[in-house]
Amino acid sequence: MAHVGSRKRSRSRSRSRSGRRGSEKRSKRSSKDASRNCSASRSQGHKAGSASGVEERSKHKAQRTSRSSSTSSSSSSSSSASSSSSSDGRKKRAKHKEKKRKKKKKKRKKKLKKRVKEKAVAVHQAEALPGPSLDQWHRSAGEDNDGPVLTDEQKSRIQAMKPMTKEEWDARQSVIRKVVDPETGRTRLIKGDGEVLEEIVTKERHREINKQATRGDGLAFQMRTGLLP
């Protein structure tokens, strides 16, 4: 009987131990399942969070690209508008300058035409009013006996005022005359109205001319300074 009781006790103990082991195994399994479920839920949450972050990032990128495109389009439109306005301003300035230049040209042409007309009128008036001739002087002298009598010098001046032909001019310019300088005493050859000619002389004649010239220079100096009585 004692042996049977010991067997029963050992069986009950083994059963209780096996029950405990089973319960421990079950608890371990349940804890493992719970940990697995937690890790799975965590991984799912992490995946969901990462997916939402990716979506938000993609949204931000799209917004940035749209903003950059809008800013670039606005800047390009503003630059094109500024360039068009600057080109319009340049064209207006060029047109204004061209108008000013044309006005100045017209004014210059008018002034030139006016001057030419004035000169032509003056020349025509001078031609229409000729100066007094020698015949007119003679007529006036014959008509008015009480008037002044013309001298030879006045007659020569009046004659010089008359137009001469080419033959008369050549004959006048071909006349050679000797003129004595009162200050130096030198005798010069003058052709026509004032062309001075050189006279070819010998050495002795040249010395005499120089002596006369120096003597005349001295006398002229003494007369100017008052040294001569």
Curated annotation (Swiss-Prot):
Domain of life: Eukaryota
Transmembrane segments: none
Sorted UniProt keywords: Isopeptide bond, mRNA processing, mRNA splicing, Nucleus, Phosphoprotein, Ubl conjugation
Keyword Ubl conjugation part of the UniProt annotation: yes
Any GO CC annotation of this UniProt entry: nuclear speck
Glycyl lysine isopeptide (Lys-Gly) (interchain with G-Cter in SUMO2) crosslink location in chain: 191
GO biological process terms held by the UniProt record: mRNA processing; RNA splicing
Region (Disordered): 1-152
Protein location: Nucleus, Nucleolus; Nucleus speckle
Annotated InterPro entries: Nucl_RNA-splicing_assoc_SR-25
Signal peptide span: none
UniProt keyword Ubl conjugation, yes or no: yes
Pfam families given in the database record: SR-25
Residues recorded as bearing Phosphoserine in the entry: 140, 174
Low complexity: compositionally biased ranges: 66-87
Distribution of this protein across tissues and organs: Widely expressed. Expressed at high level in testis and thymus.
Biased composition (Basic and acidic residues): 21-35
Ranges of biased composition (kind: Basic residues): 1-20, 90-117
Oligomeric form and interacting partners: Interacts with ZCCHC17. Interacts with SRSF2. Interacts with ARL6.
Family: Belongs to the ARL6IP4 family.
Biological role: Involved in modulating alternative pre-mRNA splicing with either 5' distal site activation or preferential use of 3' proximal site.
Protein name: ADP-ribosylation factor-like protein 6-interacting protein 4
The species this protein was found in: Mus musculus
Primary gene name: Arl6ip4
